[in-house]
């Protein structure tokens, strides 16, 4: 990895979601509360996306800092440069095929431990009493919590004596740790890489394929991330004075996650988990998942799906005009295409009577799609003259 590739190089993960990217900076903070990102240069092309490159395709990484970066790349690199060189075939190398894989198991850490429901209810009531308020949990609810915890009561809640509903916030008697309910104990990620390289007297090539799958931590309504990578590098001496180089890469990543139902969760399930009372039921006596748990939103609700396609390729001709004198012409296409869909699916909860009731903030049923694209075309033409005179070098 990049960590440790150079002094002062800091890499920070932006969250724990399967599609979380990484932020990179050199020398830490560059201003009050901010840290500028270094310029990424992949095979001589500026502005590559380091989060979409397959690490298995990388041959070497180097870091340029401070004045050295500005001297070469000018105002494009005020925060340093990370140079990435991808693999190529080597002259005289026979055809080589490589395959490797990696399986990773992850567990959430640092999750709060919730009080059991009876302890929570008593402390909650005491806090209200300290302020001169009435208790939120009555004695009947407290007795049922105790009975549920000692095993004499089997259901997590009971029906209200009036109306067609189950007792919830102040009346349910479950004993749930919502962090353990919402999150898996372990999630798995896997990565597979295939590389083919080779060379003849006049040409060399490298082709790399990569597949990366990351499972999320949701126990219900699994969130997941997939990325596919393709890279092809080719260099060929067409004549003794003309060389053709091609470098191309394509990546596609797809993130599929439950819709957050902003009106009900505030757009953040973590926000909801921290607010849930441990006495709330996961399952009602009729066997249906409760409305208040919000698990139905994860399990049966709509999905948010985002797909990013990123093609980039460079074609280059290098002509040797004379000893130490070359001319180069190249063209680069750099594109990014994003497609996102958001589905709000109307959900229903089962009532004690057997009737279904619409869950609040899940209607109307809706579907939205957005599409964004970015394209950049770069053409360069330049000449180089390189002359060595003893201990002196002239390069123009």
Predicted regions and their residues:
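Short, well-ordered coil/turn residues that connect adjacent beta-strands
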Residues: 59-60, 240, 313, 323
């Amino acid at each position: 990895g990049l960590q440790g590739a150079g002094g002062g190089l800091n890499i920070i993960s932006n969250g724990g979601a399967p599609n979380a990217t990484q932020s990179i900076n050199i020398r830490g903070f560059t201003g009050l509360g901010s840290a500028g990102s270094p310029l990424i240069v992949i095979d001589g092309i500026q502005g590559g996306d380091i989060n979409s490159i397959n690490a298995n395709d990388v041959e070497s990484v180097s870091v340029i800092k401070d004045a050295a970066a500005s001297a070469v790349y000018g105002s494009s690199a005020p925060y340093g440069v990370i140079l990435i060189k991808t693999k190529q075939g080597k002259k005289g190398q026979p055809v080589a095929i490589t395959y490797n894989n990696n399986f990773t198991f992850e567990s959430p850490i640092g999750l709060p431990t919730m009080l059991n429901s009876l302890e929570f209810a008593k402390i909650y009531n005491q806090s209200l009493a300290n302020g001169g308020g009435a208790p939120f949990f009555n004695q009947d609810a407290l007795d049922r919590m105790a009975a549920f915890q000692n095993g004499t009561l089997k259901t997590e809640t009971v029906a209200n004596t009036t109306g067609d509903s189950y007792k919830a916030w102040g009346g349910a008697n479950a004993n749930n740790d919502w962090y353990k309910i919402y999150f898996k104990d372990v999630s798995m990620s896997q990565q597979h890489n295939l590389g083919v390289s080779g060379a003849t007297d006049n040409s060399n090539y490298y082709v790399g394929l990569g597949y990366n799958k990351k499972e999320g931590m949701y126990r219900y309504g699994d969130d997941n991330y997939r990325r596919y990578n393709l890279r092809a590098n080719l260099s060929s001496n067409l004549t003794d004075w003309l060389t053709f180089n091609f470098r191309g890469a394509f990546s596609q990543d797809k993130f599929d996650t439950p819709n957050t139902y902003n009106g009900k969760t505030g757009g953040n399930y973590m926000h909801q988990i921290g607010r849930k009372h441990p006495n709330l039921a996961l399952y009602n006596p009729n066997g249906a998942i409760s409305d208040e748990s919000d698990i139905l939103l994860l399990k049966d609700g709509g999905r948010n799906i985002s797909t990013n396609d990123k093609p980039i390729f460079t074609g280059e001709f290098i002509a040797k005009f004379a000893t130490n004198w070359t001319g180069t012409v190249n063209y680069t296409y750099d594109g990014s295409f994003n497609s996102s869909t958001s589905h709000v699916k109307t959900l229903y909860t089962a009532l004690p009577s057997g009737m279904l009731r619409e869950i609040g903030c899940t209607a109307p049923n809706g579907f939205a799609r957005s599409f964004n694209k970015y394209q950049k075309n770069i053409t360069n033409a330049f000449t180089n003259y390189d002359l060595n005179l003893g201990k002196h070098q002239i390069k123009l």
